[in-house]
Amino acid sequence: MARTFFIGGNFKMNGTKASIKEIVERLNSASIPSNVEVVIAPPAAYLDHAVSLNKKAQVSVAAQNAYLKASGAFTGENSVEQIKDVGAEWVILGHSERRTYFHETDEFIADKTKFALDSGVKVILCIGETLEEKQKGITLEVVQRQLQAVLDKVQDWTNVVVAYEPVWAIGTGLAATSDDAQAIHHSIREFLAKKLSKDTAEKIRILYGGSANGKNAVTFKDKADVDGFLVGGASLKPEFVDIINSRV
C-alpha cells in the first residue's frame, strides 16, 4: 500500500531563536510536495517559536522528549499537555541518545510511549542497535526486543511512526546501504505484522535514521519498506529540503 512519505528533522540540542526562524522560513518558502509529511523537532525552548512561524500545511512540530506524568515535581521535564499547549503534535521517544546518556530503558520508553499516545500526541518511536550489537549479529534481536516492550503496553499503533536508527551510524557519517536498510525495515514490518496484523503493519511508516543527508537520501527511493527519514544534523541545513524532495 502507499504510505505517506515522512521526514522528521531532529534538531537535537542545537539552534537559536534566529537560526530556527531561518530553518522554518526556508521550509515555508520551499516547494514541498503535498503528499509528504514533515515534522521538525526543535529544542523545547523553541517549540512555541517554531509553531508560530510555520505556514506549511505539510509541516508540523514535535518535542524531542516528554515525561510520563501530566504535571508535578519533575524538574527539567516537559509534560505532554505543555507540548500540546504550544501547538506541537508529535514527540520523539526512545532516541538512542536518551537510551545511552540518560539511561532510559525499553520499559520506561514503552511507558512514555503509552502515556504520550493516551494523552493525544503522536509518537516517533526510535529503535536501533549499537556497533557492538551489530558486530555480534543481533540487530534484529535488539530491535524486536525494543519493539516488544512497546507492544506489551500499546495496542493501537495508528499514531506511531517507527524510526530505525542504527546507533553506529548516528553522527559518525557512516550509514547503512539502502539495501541493508530495506532488509532490516522489511524484517521490522514482518515482526509487527506477526504481533499486530498484516494490515496494521502495512500502514505503519518505518523511517531510516542513520545519517541521512541530501546526497544519500535519493538512493533509498525505490526501497519499499523505507517510508522516509529521521534526519539529524542535515535538518539544520539547506539540504533538508533536498531530503524532503528526494522522492519527487
Curated annotation (Swiss-Prot):
The keyword Isomerase applies. GO terms for cellular component: cytosol. It comes from the Eukaryota. One of its GO terms (biological process) is glycerol catabolic process. One of its GO terms (molecular function) is triose-phosphate isomerase activity. Gene3D superfamilies: Aldolase class I (3.20.20.70). SUPFAM superfamilies: Triosephosphate isomerase (TIM). Keywords: Gluconeogenesis, Glycolysis, Isomerase. The active site is at 95 (electrophile), 165 (proton acceptor). Substrate binds at residues 10, 12. Its EC number is 5.3.1.1. Pathway: Carbohydrate biosynthesis; gluconeogenesis; Carbohydrate degradation; glycolysis; D-glyceraldehyde 3-phosphate from glycerone phosphate: step 1/1. The keyword Isomerase applies. It catalyses: D-glyceraldehyde 3-phosphate = dihydroxyacetone phosphate. It holds the Pfam family TIM. Belongs to the triosephosphate isomerase family. Homodimer. HAMAP family: TIM_B (MF_00147_B). This is Triosephosphate isomerase. The lineage of its organism: Eukaryota, Fungi, Dikarya, Ascomycota, Saccharomycotina. The gene is TPI1.
